[in-house]
């Protein structure tokens, strides 16, 4: 597999309701950063791949379930053909040293592949040059596709040390390929003659993609500029790894401790129990502790009446990476902005955003700002309406002061209860995680005819709580292998994402099924209750499974056309969220965890009435982060004394952001943009939401949300082709027209 420094592997995800963090990226090794397979399998540069996956950095030591190198009879399973069911790797038998050995051997093997292709004396053809490059590096891909996902979900100090060790090696390896003059001459020769050959549409696209990838990675630069680019790539890769590891440490090792139970008034008992367990794990039995994982701190911000505790947690969360300690990332962020601009200018672009967007649907920063601006004004107006409701609720508590950031979620939840008599915790009693997963599978079956057979007891396990399924198509052929990894743990970075241990490919004319995993940190079971989920968590499960469906159904012969544009990749995931709370879907999975009773119509009606409340806040905090991402990367000059926090604050103040709302991620904890993967790309969730909102209308217009003709078109034109066509072409093929923003604004309650 050819690597491309401009691609990623984890798909950083979110759900539309709160634009939450779910990593996604693209490629066979990607994590989509989602999320290895952002619903794309493509060639990515190992270095970028790393940086993206590492976007999350370090955390506390956890016990490893891996064997220790040097044990009697130990062999490196990555260097042997897997004998497991469906050729899945033996995760439990691999050591960190095994990964190092296999990845380095893979680098050596790909170097030989490339030397052979570049030194071929025969006339350059698609088969002996383009296809050969596309196939190169299979051993490296196999090892990387196992290591990178586990470095995000099962990280240990040893994993993180290997991350840092491999980063410069893989960055240099990528540069060696794309700056190989003889190799580029052969690629260019095939590209220049492509129109006069009998190549298929897919082969033409592969040729174009590989040629342009060489261009984007410096093949046309002078020797002097190539050396500059190499150095920039190394520095950027290293800084992204540092940022990611700082953030992981700050997220998992920043604690707020509570000594008295009465200080947790209003917090659901299940969250109190988890805080007690966290404290006990930290040697603080009898106390309650919260770290900066959203599953830990969000319930406090939403339900706890203790204003001082909310303040402490809110500020600790917002200030991750901005505490002037050993894990402070302000200087790292400033350096990244500066180096990315240098690299963009070296490649002939006026700024970093222009360089990145050149290969996206949006094409230009101006198009991105036009979309953000179109939503910003109604979103701020709605947020200001919500602030009035918050002030009203605060006065009931005798607080005649202006709301602060730590008041927003708590009083907004109270206002929602007052307006709609809706209590989300009551709905959660019907959202047990195994039942929700049945609902996820039900939707996939109704839309596409796929079915699932659990093989957890047969498939190799990389984590005891993970489950595995065979996924069968409507004609009973094996389509994919699916792993679900939903429980939080030390060593798992924050958020949710989709990745692949093996991307879809062909071997000797036969389709090889992908091995896809959804990774999340959902609400775990408590002492007396099963794993009951929030609305956001349910939407996240549907979201990540939408990415998984994209990976299951992709059917391409060359990995260089597996990826889609970053601002298109969220369409399959976000459209899948639309079915989560449809009444006929809820009827299948929403059952009370004690009685088995189906969700009462009265509670469903209250949820529907309240579902759009709070969208001003949710939309503004997302847009604020998107603006910050773009504002930093459209700079054409970066001052040596750039203070990224002051820059962010001033830009948002000029736009009129309500004082009580912070960006969803402050710059020093904004892994999407600073960790790589979604640099100048956080807007893509909104871009894709225009597509998914308009796309779901295609189902609704028929009067049947499971309309088979529409579902068949979506699969044929969106899920299956990979990146053979550009995103807008695929969307038009599906919908018959370009998307309109109307449905998005209506869905968010920002328009009538």
PLM features: what roles do these ranges have?
Residues 523-541:
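Short pre-active-site segment immediately N-terminal to the catalytic Zn-binding motif
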Residues 55-58:
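C-terminal motif of bacterial Sec signal peptides marking the signal peptidase cleavage site
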Residues 9-14, 18-24, 29-31, 36:
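Short, positively charged and aromatic/hydrophobic N-terminal segments
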